[in-house]
Amino acid sequence: VLLLAFCAAAMLTVQAQPTVTNSWTKSQTDILSVANVNNSNPVAVSAQGDMYATGLFTESFTFGGKEIEAVATSSYLLKYGTDGAEKWGVALTGAATIKTITTDGAGNVYIAGNFADELTFGSTDGNTQVKEGIKMDGTPIADQAAGFVAKYDVNGVLKAVQSFVSKPLPELEATGIYFPEAGDYRFDINNIAYSDGKLYASASYKGLTENNGFSFKGGYFDLDGGGFWYGDLVSGAVFYLNDQLEVDGILANMGVTGGKSTDLSSVQSVSFAVAEGKLYSGFVASGKQTLTIGSKEQAFDLSQENGVTEYGHILSIIDLADGSSSLTKKYSTTHDAYGNYCFIKSMLVKGDVLLLGGTFNAKLAFDQNIDAVSTNDLYVAVLNKNTLDVNNAVASKVNEGDANSKKEEFGGMTVCGDYVYMIGHTAVIASHAVETPLTFWIDTTNGTMTQANPANLATGVAASGTKLAIAQTQVADQKLENIFSLNEVSNATGISSTEQGAGVSVYPNPVVDVLNFTTPCDVVIINLIGVTVKQAENVSSLPVSDLISGQYIIKLTTEDGTSTAKVIKK
């Protein structure tokens, strides 16, 4: 038995991080001044293996044999083939920033972001479309406060585009003492994802934004109830769009209870993930907030006492068949009201886990034993997608320097096998100037983190299957270079096995009391140092409540062969 255990252990290897092999690398140089860099280049990989890249540019350039022309600080969308060949490029001509990108199974690409003034959406067939942004007193504002979403087909033909142009809340205008400045009312789409024939999006917003009969209404404050100072408060929503990219339904929204507050409490961030007929929403908020999902409203009274504010991280599971919520769970952390950095920036589903990524200060809401170093830290939390219980969580633990002047900024994350690849950087708070690039590999099966030391700043990341797309920037001789690469990822299993063939599934995972097996089998449970801690023959279930918490290897044998599985005992 001991020999069997050690032989099994020898075939099981813990990977510190996957192996990444570059397939190709391309770059664009000197099309944007160093002063205009925004440290964000959202990228995507299609199911066909093509890579889409985005960014800002102020100088015209040639791509795929055609000139991409700039007006002011425009945005570009580029398509590279599986071999890195330049397929096509289009410009969003005017003042625009692409914030998020995704693809569908047919290779269509969707982009969303913000714009100002007049924006022309390019198209490879020459049929462009123009959208106008927010105006104040009849004059376009310079702030990129209007939102947009656009769809392009595999050949770069513009198929649909929608703008989201906010206006003042009628309640605020009625006060007679509301004097908004540019950007006080706005619509910011921060994430889009395509699933089962629909495009989903999340947005934060202030003021009133209307589209296709649906209204997104921010909150407002009457400070201390004195009737002398009014202003806008941020609300958030997760919604879906039809083929014309019009709003077709709002799945979840959160805003200040009653639409009005006497303090500055608001929604801090909103994100979501969608998979297998379920949507997982995530809001971070403070003060008195109401979450609405379908016809159900749930109020949250987040504490604000003695200068300490509670920041609720509110997660829900929504059944897309009927729009109802089966579960909502709140995780919280508290800190003084100055300088909040508690945000859920990204959510992904991988197998049975829900992955959350973002930043936090003080204590991490998903693990109160984790404290931020200096100003704030990046984090990844791994949750059971069915119960929203936390499996494990990790933080960057980087000391960025003076808490009054430096911080860490989250750049994005994606999933490769059992690993999350997270990017970010340290920056100067006042200017957002980058100081140190940060990249991490996180093994979701056990919560271990490996920090890399990249030479360049990673500004975008996405994966599809074993293909990993990375955008980077570097500055040399006062010239900015955007670098795009497609890479092949291997050895992406946290604990890999050479044995295959039994075809037995193990559940639940994580487990508390009893492990179940879909087929009767011989079972050997091995800890991570190779010692057999439990075994049984021809069983469909096995009690494990006596095992200590941690990760185990389950060796499963049937007449069809032997395989292994990873299980977390809680």
Put a short name on every predicted segment.
Residues 1-21:
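Bacterial Sec-dependent N-terminal signal peptides
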Residues 2-3, 9, 240, 317, ...:
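Generic alpha-helix initiation/capping and coil-helix boundary signal
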Residues 4-6, 49, 107, 144, ...:
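Short, functionally important structural connectors and interaction interfaces within domains
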Residues 5-6, 341, 415, 520:
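The N-terminal extracellular segments of secreted preproproteins, especially immediately downstream
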Residues 16-494:
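A sequence-level/structural motif corresponding to short, flexible coil/turn segments enriched
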Residues 496-507, 511-570:
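C-terminal outer-membrane/trafficking sorting elements
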